[in-house]
Amino acid sequence: MRERNNLIARMSLPTRRQVISGAVVAFGGAALGLTGARAGAEEEISHTAESIHQEPVFKASRKRVYEALTDAKQFEKIVQLSAAMKSGMAPGAKPAEIGRGAGGAISLFGGYVTGRQLELVPNVRIVQAWRAGGWDPGDYSIAKFELVEQGSGTKIVFDHSAFPKGKAEHLAEGWKINYWEPLEKFLS
């Protein structure tokens, strides 16, 4: 796997209300069931937060990468190869759940990561409302995986934004050791 510079940038982000409202619009006005997020959406506090940009490259087709990230059984095998599993963070007591459609729930790494699928374009894009255990109720970030054909492989143009301040370095390392490195092993 080759990875371009891991970029952590400061940028102005929408308020929680704008993010959640946008997600509701994306589902034709249907509520997502993000109870904490809706409750937290009452705050109209604009803020500046960090974001993460990574571009890992894999020796696999876009279809294969997309399936590995959206199929619970395949993703559970990735979890087994991850640093989280080795550290005991993801004991595997609760198997991965990955909703296959927009609005579907996700629960990964033994329930440590939870959220909703916001957009799924097969073999092209995955956008998730994503949160880690220990975050304040209602704190959801946006994780976007754009799958780009690169030669005989696939580059994931990955952007993670709207997460709590001070979490960028920890999250950037987490994506590397819990997603990209085990995904590379799984796909090889």
Q: What do the PLM-derived regions correspond to, one by one?
A:
Residues 158-178:
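A short acidic/glycine-rich loop-to-helix N-cap element
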Residues 14-35:
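N-terminal export leaders
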Residues 1-14, 26-27:
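N-terminal secretory signal peptides
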Residues 49-55, 62, 112, 125, ...:
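Intrinsic-disorder/low-complexity, polar/charged segments enriched in Ser/Thr/Lys/Arg/Asp/Glu/Gln
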Residues 73-112, 123:
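Short beta-edge strand/loop motif at the mouth of beta-sheet-based domains
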Residues 34-68, 97-99:
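C-terminal segment of N-terminal export signals and the immediately downstream linker at the start
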Residues 107-151, 161:
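Hydrophobic-ligand binding "helix-grip"
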Residues 65, 75, 106, 117, ...:
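Hydrophobic pocket/interface hotspot
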